[in-house]
Amino acid sequence: MLSLAKAKLAVVGIGRQCVAVRTLNGARAVHRSFSSSEHDQDSSTSENELFDIIISGGGMVGTAMACSLGLDPNLTGKKILLLEAGHEKKMDKIPETYSTRVSSISPGSATLLSGLGAWDHIVNMRCKPYNKMQVWDACSDALITFDKENLQDEMAYIVENDVIVAALTKQLQTLSDHVKVQYRTKVVKYTWPHPYHVSESIPWVQVALANGKTLHTKLLIGADGPNSMVRREAGIPTVKWNYDQSAVVAVLHLSEPTENNVAWQRFLPTGPIAMLPLSDTESSLVWSTSHQHAEELLQMDEESFVDAINSAFWSNENHSELVETAGSLFRMALSVLMPDSGSARQLPPSVSGIGPKSRVMFPLGMGHATEYIRHRVALIGDAAHRVHPLAGQGANLGFGDVSYLTQVLSQAAYNGKDIGAMQHLLEFETERQRHNLPMMTAIDLMKRLYSSNTAPMVLLRTFGLQATNAVPPLKEQIMAFASK
């Protein structure tokens, strides 16, 4: 349950629409007006130019890192560069159709994005809050719900990844006096400094670009995704495995308009299926299943695919009489011990269609860098950790990295210290692994627990789900941990 809870972040109220979350206090609340400019990859940097910080990777987490550093008053005057291999992500006009790649943004991440000045842009584009989550087992009647006491408060927000990147990019343009950005720039090699000064050794990280230039930096931040070149070339080992599963994602059209403020997740014998709200009439599908079944789902005609989705959420074909009887007796015992516990089951909305060309599949796996840092190197986001989407925590873990690494570097700069020194980076690694590892372990265990439909395993998780659902303080702790 720990993992599923993650998506159910506790936090700021925002009414029916996504309204601006409170800005961070202290340094992050300081706003400056800077001129916006286009970033030209040829004129932005000169040969052998030395930067204080170079960020490799301009996705959601890398761009957030650049904004966060550029806004920190203690880092004013530091030379910061963001390198991105792709084009600049702009969204001058909101697309009529929704993207299949979305993230569940926790209250903690929403607060970070607000402090960076990006949340208002997201609100002006589009996002969908939800204030309840229902998770239930396809092999029994066990369920658990997470909600806020005040249903006007949001647990989380479903936001398209493209919207997040576009909002951060727009904000980054206002920081052009503090952060340089080079798009369409490919790194071909990193050369690492010796951890101890030796004669004729290079003191900084060297970054060789495909255009022939070589840059130098006192600190390299790898935000270049699960196949991180920074991590690989730094020789940082990774513990990883594939789940023999693929996720099928799609945009769903609901049968009728609804308030659509509930996130739904059901654990099927083949993997979890989730329906996340996008609007009053559309939701996002994330269906984790076997590779073969995923291929079959992609090949189905639309009508068959829609029928398969509705059946996955509504069918009781995997129930067993033994489990139902045992679960019913356990539920009765809980109601005697805790009369006010439990939750009323809600029925998910039915699906009537899918967005055009919105069905996509991708393989699932887990990965964790054994170290987040090396001398003058730090890893953040998917470069450091990759998780199963069943908990919706991938982006939130990355934004947590951004927040804490900024804090550590800001303090080092304030104290006049070397921002690339291991002393400060170790603090970042310790704190983030302390948070990320329990979350990743819970997600992995949850995935494995629900991968079996044998009677003993189904009974174990049925009792566990019902017991957790009957103890509100425990659910509150789960939500609090997931909302960070």
Swiss-Prot record:
Q: Which cofactor does it need?
A: FAD
Quick one: which pathway?
A: Cofactor biosynthesis; ubiquinone biosynthesis
Instruction: Extract the InterPro entries matched here.
Output: FAD-bd, FAD/NAD-bd_sf, Ubi_Hdrlase_CS, UbiH/COQ6, UbiH/COQ6_monooxygenase, UbQ_mOase_COQ6
* Cellular compartment(s): Mitochondrion inner membrane; Golgi apparatus; Cell projection
Query: Has keyword Protease?
Result: no
* Substrates-to-products reaction catalysed: a 4-hydroxy-3-(all-trans-polyprenyl)benzoate + 2 reduced [2Fe-2S]-[ferredoxin] + O2 + 2 H(+) = a 3,4-dihydroxy-5-(all-trans-polyprenyl)benzoate + 2 oxidized [2Fe-2S]-[ferredoxin] + H2O; a 2-methoxy-6-(all-trans-polyprenyl)phenol + 2 reduced [2Fe-2S]-[ferredoxin] + O2 + 2 H(+) = a 2-methoxy-6-(all-trans-polyprenyl)benzene-1,4-diol + 2 oxidized [2Fe-2S]-[ferredoxin] + H2O
Which NCBIfam families does the record cross-reference, listed alphabetically? COQ6 (TIGR01989), Ubi-OHases (TIGR01988)
Q: Which protein is depicted?
A: Ubiquinone biosynthesis monooxygenase COQ6, mitochondrial
List the source organism: Danio rerio
- Taxonomic lineage per UniProt? Eukaryota, Metazoa, Chordata, Craniata, Vertebrata
Q: Which gene encodes it?
A: coq6
